Amino acid sequence: MRPALAVGLVFAGCCSNVIFLELLARKHPGCGNIVTFAQFLFIAVEGFLFEADLGRKPPAIPIRYYAIMVTMFFTVSVVNNYALNLNIAMPLHMIFRSGSLIANMILGIIILKKRYSIFKYTSIALVSVGIFICTFMSAKQVTSQSSLSENDGFQAFVWWLLGIGALTFALLMSARMGIFQETLYKQFGKHSKEALFYNHALPLPGFIFLASDIYDHAVLFNKSELYEIPGIGVTLPIMWFYLLMNIITQYVCIRGVFILTTECASLTVTLVVTLRKFVSLIFSILYFQNPFTLWHWLGTLFVFIGTLMYTEVWNNLGTTKSEPQKDNKKN
């Protein structure tokens, strides 16, 4: 029952989270900082109450290590959300972030001196080609859609390039954080709920530097049209409703992934997360009518096939199916 519940939470939480994020970004493209702050604050308060036991429970991993991890996590979160301000469409944002495998492999080779099989290198090549196709076609759309003047078109393209640079930086930083996390867990053991709390609580003072931008967008949110929440009858500005739902759905998504990792094999987790990304992408394209050409579909297909190849899904599924047959023969 718990694995089925976890899968339901991941699909319901993560997919709807993307929807509310896009609703926010479409109305106010620069709202990344207030969204990040609200998400961090909610998870930090929840963790302080239920994980840290109101601050009475000492951390299993020393705070100095969390400080390093938090710096990376805070940077990745802010940069990823800020990239939406830089002419980056939500579908490209999702596809580009699927390139985490490439970043993990590159840094794994450089830092951990890892070596991989030809099969894995082939899968990474597929992911790279897929991301390149989607990025290249998106670049053409940015320049063609900016038809006001040559200067406007060039300016839009420059902002888009900065957005691609921001996503690339966040991708590499996220991979580096994953390697650092891996070494910490080997040394101190896995404490994922504790890490979730400290990764969101410790960066909160850093939002002081973004306070002006957060306040400006809070004012803009207050000026948005009023919306009555169905069934409750409470009326509030619709942008605050979108933000509230974004926070709740992100929490549901995170909890679903956590339950999934504790209840299911890594193969199941990989399959569910990969399928969830694909469903989110399809919904974003169809519901929000984001421009998506045949080339984008081809690039997306390359990314997801490469991801499944890298995680050796087909090999593992074949092994899983053959095991019951062997057991039956023994009996």
From Swiss-Prot:
Ranges in coiled-coil conformation: none
Similarity section: Belongs to the nucleotide-sugar transporter family. SLC35B subfamily.
Function: Antiporter that transports nucleotide sugars across the endoplasmic reticulum (ER) membrane in exchange for another nucleotide sugar. May couple UDP-alpha-D-glucuronate (UDP-GlcA) or UDP-alpha-D-xylose (UDP-Xyl) efflux to UDP-alpha-D-glucuronate (UDP-GlcA) influx into the ER lumen, which in turn stimulates glucuronidation and excretion of endobiotics and xenobiotics.
Motif Mediates endoplasmic reticulum retention positions after renumbering to this chain: 326-331
Main location: endoplasmic reticulum
Entry's Gene Ontology cellular component terms: endoplasmic reticulum membrane; Golgi membrane
Gene Ontology MF: a single term: UDP-N-acetylglucosamine transmembrane transporter activity
Tree of life domain: Eukaryota
Keywords linked to the UniProt accession: Endoplasmic reticulum, Membrane, Sugar transport, Transmembrane, Transmembrane helix, Transport
Membrane topology qualifier: Multi-pass membrane protein
Compartments, record wording: Endoplasmic reticulum membrane
Pfam families xrefs: UAA (PF08449)
Protein name (record): Nucleotide sugar transporter SLC35B4
Membrane spanning residue stretches: 4-24, 30-50, 59-79, 92-112, 117-137, 153-173, 201-221, 229-249, 251-267, 268-288, 291-311
Catalysis performed (reactions): UDP-N-acetyl-alpha-D-glucosamine(in) + UDP-alpha-D-glucuronate(out) = UDP-N-acetyl-alpha-D-glucosamine(out) + UDP-alpha-D-glucuronate(in); UDP-alpha-D-xylose(in) + UDP-alpha-D-glucuronate(out) = UDP-alpha-D-xylose(out) + UDP-alpha-D-glucuronate(in)
